Amino acid sequence: MVSTAVRTFARGIPWNLFLLTLGCGLFALGVKAVAIPHMLISGGVFGTALLINYMTETLSPAVWNVLLNIPIFIAGWLFVGRRFVLYSLYGLAVVSVATQYLDMTINITDPILASIAAGCICGLGLGIVLHSIGCDGGLTIISIALHKRYGISVGQFSLLYNITLFVLAFSMYNPDSMLYSLIMIFVYSKVMEDRKSVV
């Protein structure tokens, strides 16, 4: 009886919105307060938004993230579960709004320490998000849609996308920043692996 009630609560709207708010908020904190001041990029679509922002210095990363996600959410609405897409739309809103308006910088001068700190904060946030029925948009939705439509492995597509992103980043942007970004990616991947101990 108790376990049934717990499962029902875990699938409920308030709990999932709480997880998405907390997780996406932490991810945005790691990006805005640590990664951006050191010109680091994360993986996925948000990493693409950061790279475009660094190279063009036009729109903010948050705005680029929203623009890049528009066709992704349209595809997700057609090929992925609509409940998942609606929760993910909320997650995208939290990440984008927090990244746009959060005015905070964690004063870390050493780029390696900054990469580790950004990885820990972002990884903790994404680990929490993984406990919800949703995501922060972007690569997760693309991967699921391609898997459902064409049977492409979610993990393989994510890996291929991020390899392509970093190859382009190395060739088009500051190699030092990209190497530090790889440290950040490695750290937050490890933190995400331990997500069961977080929530």
Where do the protein language model's features map onto the residues?
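Conserved small/polar residues in nucleotide/adenosyl-binding loops
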Residues: 198-199
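Juxtamembrane/interfacial segments flanking transmembrane helices
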Residues: 40-45, 131-142
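Short, Lys/Arg-rich, polar N-terminal cytosolic tail immediately upstream
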Residues: 1-13
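C-terminal ends of transmembrane helices
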Residues: 23, 27, 71-82, 132, ...
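Short amphipathic alpha-helical coupling elements at transmembrane boundaries
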Residues: 47-54, 141-151
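Alpha-helical transmembrane segments of multipass membrane proteins
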Residues: 28-29, 51, 70-75, 97, ...
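Structural signature of hydrophobic alpha-helical transmembrane segments
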Residues: 52-67, 111-120, 124, 182
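Mid-bilayer segments of alpha-helical transmembrane spans in multi-pass integral membrane proteins
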Residues: 93, 97-101, 112-133, 153-156
